[in-house]
Curated annotation (Swiss-Prot):
Amino-acid positions noted as binding Zn(2+) in the UniProt annotation, renumbered to this chain: C180, H350, H354, H360
Main location: membrane
Gene Ontology molecular function, alphabetical: immunoglobulin receptor binding; integrin binding; metal ion binding; metalloendopeptidase activity; metallopeptidase activity; SH3 domain binding
Subcellular location field: Endomembrane system; Cell junction, Adherens junction; Cell projection, Cilium, Flagellum; Cytoplasmic vesicle, Secretory vesicle, Acrosome
Domain text: The cytoplasmic domain is required for SH3GL2- and SNX9-binding.
Domain Disintegrin positions: 423-510
Pfam name, any one: Disintegrin
Stretch list, region Disordered: 17-49, 738-864
Record topology, Cytoplasmic segments: 720-864
Induction context: In response to sciatic nerve injury.
UniProt motif (SH3-binding) ranges: 816-822, 851-857
Identification of the protein by name: Disintegrin and metalloproteinase domain-containing protein 15
């Protein structure tokens, strides 16, 4: 492999290193300590490109400080490429904890140690599918992937800065081969499953769930004494740890999983556990120390032990399947089998994958892996054939999705504390102070809400599309459900209304009942025996008959046990604890969804005179999986009893009842040991009852209020009508006359023909007697209404009757001429005046007074 020509250019905003506590000197020689260049305050240079500016020597760059952006020109196989790099700030969130030990055994803790951010991520210019992972902590080490067929390692020691960079193809690396027993995986999809696990910035702007949300694994790496002796300079050990963590983060990013290094512990004086070449024994010892010593003082999601000790057999690591977030089993042991960080990082990624629920890839083409042979090597393959895996297969993607939907990984949604303040840098995919968003490089930013040049929200945008509480650049309202519950032990989460991110995942606390009383919640999962069988054997699977289960697990062999001892032998269960041992199921699929059937045993048992056919299997999960599939903690094993530590124990040991008593009967305990109050009760102790403010209650109150108003209006109208009726009875016909003038209109009756007096002609107009019910209002023109307003009112009571009957007289003089002003025309559609309805049959008996009657009232002129 020819040596590459390297230059660095385009440096921007390099931050000066912050002072850190002195690191221990573990015995490195003076020459080794002088080999690492000192860090000095860096200087800012103007933007430069290859075509317009001369290259800057790499030695000068590394000796003057590490910039936040770096562009490296590189020749690979005769082709010139430019690496565009940004510091990976998600790798070291906040200021991690460093732990080492003095000769007298005193533990030294540097909480919030200022690690210089010397690791970069990026891509090759002009190659969208490429990626680069590189650390410049001490020299140069990294990985460049142009395509699945072309991958290269970069390496340059701290004392070799004047020499050319060494570039090697992945296929040329000679790493010690390692293998796990082949897992003839039966989960072979018949058709391509949808790719739901894309990187966050490629997601559609839809409501997201646990599958598509970005998860983060808070990782602690523990270096045993043999690893410390291999790298006696503590800074060198720290740099190597950072390089391994960077590759882990790079491997898991396509699965929407980030890896953050929150702590490093170095056993600088002696090993704190008993070391063993048997990885199962070593794992058991390490997990016990993690549970009792490490976890209480340094919270994390997974701990990985790195040792130089050679393991017996071909294995280079071991972990427990589907154990992430478990305080008892979330960890692994790994052998530092190569000077290349790529091989070590790939091995740790393999064991961490087991903790996340990933099984070994099936041989053949059932689990596609990018790249042709011999480059085809995925991380979860049982055997790497001397080539480190660089990618996860589609089978690994589907397995992670299934594990998440089954309730695994509640701790992965809690992001570490905020990072230490650093200078802002637009384009590093981290929202720095002064920025509103950051979607990365211009060619990878797909966020329509974010301006990738300024890292500010675009006009009209309220948020960046980097979380489930932002849709179409608008914040979802407070109370909008952003994460659905995955099982009985999960609680829904809701947007707060002021952030695009969904709150951390909250689950029911340990000991809360679930699955209709079949189990209780443990570590955020509902440990129903039926569901465990269906997760292993598919739909329709059920627990085996009690006699078959007890017989198998009390024998203590590969077909049934309560687990393995540190020496690797199977441990039989006590009869009381049999249900807490190995999973014993019936029905379902012929082949399991996890692992493969290595052997099968059938036996006929007799119980109460009845023969029972029992069948047991020996599942092969791979040599690097420490334990068989045992019943999960929290599985019900009797009335008031659950499995704790593979023993059937009282559920009260989990403390759920004690925690629930703080909620005063109006709530349950969540995973943070806080009360999750029932609706209508206020936290934190669920003692105060809230006012009913739900939409249903509000609607009922409004309906009752409206009904009350209607009742009052009806009562008022009835009272006024009764009062009006009584007044009319007291006043007599005047009330009736006023009703004829101003009462509401009534439907007119049939027209009646008016009677004529004998010897008279038909009168043009007759005066109607006041009707017994009001007449319809007469349409009077406005102009005439104004003239009538000046005239006198009609008499208030009728004229007295005259006993003298008026007799007809001879026809008098002719009628006077009609008025000069024409009468108003009848409204269209109004019946003739003579057809107006009258009371009774319409006949009119006229009584004439003895003296001439006064002229008709002014109002009657309307009818002349």
């Amino acid at each position: 492999m020819r040596l590459a020509l390297l230059w660095a250019l385009g440096l921007l905003g390099a931050g000066s290193p912050r002072p850190s506590p002195p690191l221990p000197n573990i015995g490195g020689t003076e020459e080794e300590q002088q080999a690492s260049p000192e860090r000095t305050q860096s200087r800012s240079l103007e933007n430069q490109v290859v075509q317009d500016s001369p290259p800057i020597n790499l030695t000068e760059v590394l000796q003057t400080g590490l910039p936040e952006t770096l562009r490296i020109g590189l020749e690979l196989d005769g082709e010139n490429h430019i690496l565009e790099l940004q510091q990976n700030r998600d790798l070291v969130p906040g200021r991690p904890t460093l732990v080492w030990y003095q000769p007298d055994g005193t533990r030294m803790v540097s909480e919030g140690h200022s690690l210089e951010n010397c690791c970069y991520r990026g891509r090759v210019q002009g190659r969208p599918s490429s990626w680069v992972s590189l650390c410049a902590c001490s020299g140069i080490r990294g990985l460049v992937v142009l395509s699945p067929e072309r991958s290269y390692t970069l390496e340059l020691g701290p004392g070799d800065l004047q020499r050319p960079l060494i570039v090697s193809r992945i296929q040329d690396l000679l790493l010690p081969g390692h293998t796990c027993a082949p897992s003839w995986h039966a989960f072979v999809p018949t058709e391509a499953a949808p790719d739901l696990l894309l990187e966050q910035h490629h997601l559609r702007r839809l409501k997201r769930d646990v599958v598509t949300e970005t998860k983060i694994v808070e990782l602690v790496i523990v270096a045993d004494n043999s690893e410390v002796r291999k790298y006696p300079d503590f800074q060198q050990l720290l740099n190597r740890t950072l390089e391994v963590a960077l590759l882990l983060d790079t491997f898991f990013q396509p699965l929407n999983v980030r890896v953050a290094l929150v702590g490093l512990e170095a056993w600088t004086q002696r090993d704190l556990i008993e070391m063993s070449s048997n990885p199962a024994v070593l794992l058991d010892n390490f997990l016990r120390w993690r549970r009792t010593d490490l976890l209480p003082r340094l919270p994390h999601d997974s701990a990985q032990l790195v040792t130089v000790t050679s393991f017996s057999g071909p294995m280079v690591g071991m972990a427990i399947q589907n154990s992430i977030c478990s305080p008892d089993f979330s960890g692994g042991v790994n052998m530092d089998h190569s000077t290349s960080i790529l091989g070590v990082a790939s091995s740790i990624a393999h064991e961490l994958g087991h903790s996340l629920g990933l099984d070994h890839d099936s041989p053949g083409n059932s689990c596609p892996c990018p790249g042709p042979a011999p480059a085809k090597s995925c991380i979860m393959e049982a055997s790497t054939d001397f080539l480190p895996g660089l990618n996860f297969s589609n089978c690994s993607r589907w397995a992670l999705e299934k594990a998440l939907l089954d309730g695994m990984g509640s701790c992965l949604f809690e992001w570490p504390p905020s990072r230490a303040p650093m200078s802002s840098l637009c384009g590093n995919m981290f929202v720095d102070p002064g920025e509103q968003c950051d979607c990365g490089f211009p060619d990878e930013c797909t966020d329509p809400c974010c301006d990738y040049f300024t890292c500010q929200l675009r006009p009209g945008a309220q948020c960046a599309s980097d979380g489930p509480c932002c849709q179409n650049c608008k914040l979802q309202p407070a109370g909008w459900q952003c994460r659905l519950p995955t099982d009985d032990c999960d609680l829904p989460e809701f947007c707060l209304g002021d952030s695009s991110q969904c709150p951390p995942d909250i689950r029911l606390g340990d000991g809360e009942p679930c699955a209709s009383g079949e189990a209780v919640c443990m570590h955020g999962r509902c440990a129903s025996y039926t569901r465990q069988c269906q997760s292993l054997w598919g739909p329709g699977a059920q627990p085996a008959a009690p006699l078959c289960l007890q017989t198998a697990n009390t024998r203590g062999n590969a077909f049934g046990s309560c687990g393995r001892s540190p020496s690797g032998s199977y441990m039989p269960c006590n009869l009381r604890d049999a249900i807490c041992g190995q999973l014993q199921c019936q029905w379902g699929r012929n082949q399991p969804l996890l692992g493969s059937v290595q052997d099968q045993l059938s036996e006929v048992l007799e119980a109460n005179g009845t023969q029972l056919n029992c069948s047991w299997v020996d599942l092969d999960l791979g040599n690097d999986v420490a334990q068989p599939l045992l019943a999960l903690p929290g599985t019900a094993c009797g009335p008031g009893l659950v499995c704790i530590g593979h023993r059937c124990q009282p559920v009260d040991l989990l403390g759920a009842q004690e925690c629930r008593s703080k909620c005063h009967g109006h709530g349950v305990c969540d995973s943070s040991r806080h009360c999750h109050c029932d609706e209508g009760w206020a936290p934190p102790d669920c003692m105060t009852q809230l006012r009913a403010t739900s939409s249903l209650t509000t609607g009922l109150l409004l309906s009752l209020l409206l009904l009350l108003v209607l009742v009052l209006l009806g009562a008022s109208y009835w009272y006024r009508a009764r009062l009006h009726q009584r007044l009319c009875q007291l006043k007599g016909s005047s009330c009736q006359y006023r009703a004829a003038q101003s009462g509401p209109p009534e439907r007119p009756g049939p027209p009646q023909r008016a009677q004529q007096m004998p010897g008279t002609k038909q009168a043009n107009v007759s005066f109607p007697v006041p009707p017994s019910r009001p007449l319809p209002p007469n349409p009077v023109p406005k102009k005439l209404q104004a003239e009538l307003a000046d005239r006198s009112n009609p008499p208030t009571r009728p004229l007295p009757a005259d006993p003298v009957v008026w007799r007809p007289k001879p026809q008098g003089p002719t009628k006077p001429p009609p008025p000069r002003k024409p009468l108003p025309a009848n409204p269209q559609g109004r019946p003739p005046l003579g057809d107006l309805p009258g009371p009774g049959d319409g006949s009119l008996q006229l009584v004439v007074p003895s003296r001439p009657a006064p002229p008709p009232p002014a109002a009657s002129s309307l009818y002349l």
